[in-house]
């Protein structure tokens, strides 16, 4: 489910940093 995806994304974003988070959010919004 989306909650599992959110957990994975959260851990990944902590490693990758805020710049990647912003890019991912932009991609998700489209």
From Swiss-Prot:
Which keywords annotate this record?
Antibiotic, Antimicrobial, Fungicide, Secreted, Toxin
Compartments in which it is found: Secreted
For this UniProt entry, what is the primary localization, expressed as one broad class?
secreted
Question: Matching InterPro entries, A to Z?
Answer: Poneritoxin
Tissue expression as described in the entry: Expressed by the venom gland.
Tell me which domain of life the UniProt entry assigns to the organism this sequence originates from: Eukaryota
Annotated GO molecular function terms are: toxin activity
* A GO cellular-component term linked to this record: extracellular region
A Gene Ontology biological process in which this protein takes part is:
killing of cells of another organism
Signal sequence, start to end: none
- Described purpose of this protein according to its UniProt entry: Shows a broad spectrum of activity against both Gram-positive and Gram-negative bacteria. Also has antimicrobial activity against S.cerevisiae. Has insecticidal and non-hemolytic activity.
Q: Which family does it belong to?
A: Belongs to the ponericin-G family.
- Name the chain's protein: M-poneritoxin-Ng3a
Provide the species name.
Answer: Neoponera goeldii (Ponerine ant)
């Amino acid at each position: 489910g989306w909650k599992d995806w959110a957990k994975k994304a959260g851990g990944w974003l902590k490693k990758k940093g805020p710049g990647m988070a912003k890019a991912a959010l932009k991609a998700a919004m489209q």
